[in-house]
Curated annotation (Swiss-Prot):
General function of this protein: Modulates RecA activity.
Stored Gene3D superfamilies: Winged helix-like DNA-binding domain superfamily/Winged helix DNA-binding domain
Organism: Enterococcus faecalis (strain ATCC 700802 / V583)
Cytoplasm among keywords: yes
Gene Ontology CC annotations of this record: cytoplasm
Keyword Cytoplasm attached: yes
One GO BP annotation of this record: regulation of DNA repair
Protein name: Regulatory protein RecX
Family, as annotated: Belongs to the RecX family.
Keywords recorded for this protein, A-Z: Cytoplasm
Localization per Swiss-Prot or TrEMBL: Cytoplasm
Domain of life (superkingdom): Bacteria
Amino acid sequence: MTTITRISKDKGEFYLLWLSSGEKLRVSEDILVRQRLLKGQELSDTLIEEIKKASSYDVGLQMAMNYLSYQLRSKKEIFTYLKEKEIVPEDRVKIVQRLEELRLLDDAIFSESYVRTAMRTSDKGPRNVAQQLKQKGISEEDIQHGLTFYTLDEQLNVATATAEKAMKRYRTKSFKDALQKMRLHLMQKGFTNEIIDLALESLAFEKDEEQEQQALDKEGERLWRANQRFDFSKKVQKVKQSLFQKGFDYDLIQQFISEKEVEHDE
């Protein structure tokens, strides 16, 4: 028979049973009282297994509730967390069911909260938000429920702010190239073409001729250096082609090339 050599307080409502075998059992106060566990008490192997089984559920439930105290979680996240904590599968199921009964776990509410937070703190469109919810194990029905709070007006607000910020990053590009990259950027963020069109229309970006000229000069010089190994004619051809592909106007490109031709003839 194994004897309880010591009982000490652990975190929360838990206690540690120190056994003569050298093993330690973590039990809840409820189990301690229910089983009338005392120092010096002898425990059969059968009783030890019963205590372990009951403790797995209690410990797992307490861990899950503590995990939920920081923020809302999806059912999948709770299952994953309990698995990492080595809670046995049958207890994971019971724990999740108990949390649902206590209304501490609800994927529909999680979806709604996640969408509201994403709208307020991120630059992600509804498609990306939906994908993230799917990765968290949220059902399609609950995803669609959450997305009802991401209204068209909210999508437009987020897309517009994202586009405005992106345009500042692309100011060294041609106006045409900047618009294309910004559109692609918004698509990658998960916005629909309809919202992207409305966002760009509301911002009413206009070409700054001076900025366009500066962007062309900078890119043109970079390309000119990059093609130094070619003869003049081939270099002109490659630079013109690259600048055109980057969205610069033909007249500006031709002006840049003309200046290079003058330098070459001197």
